[in-house]
């Protein structure tokens, strides 16, 4: 039984019913319906419950029939989120890059890439490697600038960090 049919709370049940009705009413290709089902199972159920392995499997399944680059970008972004949550930063960065190749207007992907770079910069500081720390911090700054350019009202903490570190105007 698909995860979407096992939802236990009212919100998930309501979303599932509405999504199923929309899939029947709106003309969509069979591949799009299949991709959406896997995507819905990954997002609404497995990932939100912390079942990351199952969510990843659903996202990978959603990638097979999904051909729209915009929709694929969100699937790739969500795969990156799971890898980031699991501490697999290199894999997360790869998926964020793939998402941005298909949809360069994803400020959240730029933000998450900046967070990873900032974290790596902090690690380098703790390891006594200021040159590497500076390089990672510079990369974080570039990604945050891109995120802020796409969503100017968001990422206030990043904007403050850029100001404090003197990287805002660079």
Swiss-Prot record:
Q: Which Pfam families match?
A: TPR_1
Query: Mind telling me which PANTHER family this protein's record contains?
Result: CELLULOSE SYNTHASE OPERON PROTEIN C, TPR REPEAT-CONTAINING PROTEIN MJ0263
Tell me the protein's name: Photosystem I assembly protein Ycf3
The task this protein performs is described as: Essential for the assembly of the photosystem I (PSI) complex. May act as a chaperone-like factor to guide the assembly of the PSI subunits.
For this UniProt record, the keywords arranged alphabetically read as follows: Chloroplast, Membrane, Photosynthesis, Plastid, Repeat, Thylakoid, TPR repeat
Q: Which GO terms describe its biological process?
A: photosynthesis
The listed locations are:
Plastid, Chloroplast thylakoid membrane
Q: What are the ranges of the TPR repeats?
A: 35-69, 73-106, 121-154
Q: How does it sit in the membrane?
A: Peripheral membrane protein
User: Organism, per UniProt?
Assistant: Cycas taitungensis
Q: What is any one of the record's Gene Ontology cellular component terms?
A: chloroplast thylakoid membrane
Annotated family: Belongs to the Ycf3 family.
């Amino acid at each position: 039984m698909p995860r979407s049919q096992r939802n236990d709370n009212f919100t998930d049940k309501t979303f599932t019913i509405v999504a199923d009705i929309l899939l029947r009413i709106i003309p969509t290709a069979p591949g799009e319906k299949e991709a959406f089902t896997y995507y819905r199972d990954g997002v609404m159920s497995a990932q939100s419950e912390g079942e990351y392995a199952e969510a990843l499997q659903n996202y990978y399944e959603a990638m097979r029939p999904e051909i729209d680059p915009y929709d694929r970008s969100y699937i790739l972004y969500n795969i990156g989120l799971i890898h980031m949550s699991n501490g697999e930063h290199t894999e997360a960065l790869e998926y964020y890059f793939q998402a941005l190749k298909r949809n360069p207007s994803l400020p959240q992907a730029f933000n998450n890439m900046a967070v990873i770079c900032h974290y790596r910069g902090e690690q380098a500081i703790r390891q006594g490697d200021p040159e590497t720390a500076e390089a990672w911090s510079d990369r974080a700054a570039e990604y945050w600038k891109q995120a802020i350019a796409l969503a100017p009202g968001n990422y206030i903490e990043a904007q403050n960090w850029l100001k404090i570190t003197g990287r805002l105007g660079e």
